[in-house]
Amino acid sequence: MTSSASQMDYVLPNELVDGMIAAGGKKSSVSVKNLLIRGFYSGAILGLATCLAITIGIQSGMPWLGSFIFPFGFASIVLFGMELVTGNFALLPMAVWAGKSSWSATVRNWLWVWIGNFLGTAFVAVLSLIHI
């Protein structure tokens, strides 16, 4: 007979933490090239989502309408497997504390993902400036 906990559709807290630790461990070993590419696209997607949310809010005359659009940027980043430095700020220290990564790998990841995010958002900002 199976237990009722195994029939539920939710993830237990300890399973969630284990998944986060595993994700942090995997992220700490990604190559610099992939960190920059994923970080760039992540920053660009978030920048485009911000531009779209602001445009919809202003053009519609209902600023709150943009708040429904912006989360699609975050969802896209997750679904496409991109790297956003704020998420890595949470996942990688957990992997270090669990012994799945090192602080040097964590700082390396943060640095390259931040650079990629910055370049992606700067790219969208330049395109927006050219468009104006």
Kindly label every feature range from the protein language model.
Residues S60-S76:
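Loop-to-helix transition at the N-terminal end of transmembrane alpha-helices
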Residues M1-K27:
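Short, Lys/Arg-rich, polar N-terminal cytosolic tail immediately upstream
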Residues L52-M62:
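Short, hydrophobic transmembrane alpha-helix segments
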Residues L36-A53:
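The first (N-terminal) embedded transmembrane alpha-helix
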